[in-house]
């Protein structure tokens, strides 16, 4: 079972990589896997992190078609949080 520490360590590892390099993509997949597992396990803290990330992506000008936005919405939708996903989708 993953926890906050695992997630934060994966984020730190990703930060050390050049953006969009092969190493960064590997680390990003790790971050996304941990986040997905935590939400699937019912971790409300991780759900909050996903929601915060969606707000940040919206503030940065990302669009509904952006991969990061689609992935975060999918995590919510596929774990029984369809209403929250729909609410978040309206920001984009």
Put a short name on every predicted segment.
Residues 1-4, 19, 62, 83-92:
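Short intrinsically disordered terminal tails
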């Amino acid at each position: 079972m993953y926890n906050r520490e695992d997630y934060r360590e994966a984020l730190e590892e990703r930060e050390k990589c050049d953006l969009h390099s092969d190493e960064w993509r590997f680390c990003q997949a790790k971050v996304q896997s941990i986040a997905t597992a935590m939400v699937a396990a019912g971790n409300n803290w991780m759900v909050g992190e996903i929601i915060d990330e969606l707000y940040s992506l919206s503030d940065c000008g990302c669009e509904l078609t952006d991969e990061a936005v689609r992935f975060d919405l999918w995590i919510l939708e596929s774990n029984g949080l369809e209403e929250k996903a729909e609410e978040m989708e309206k920001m984009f």
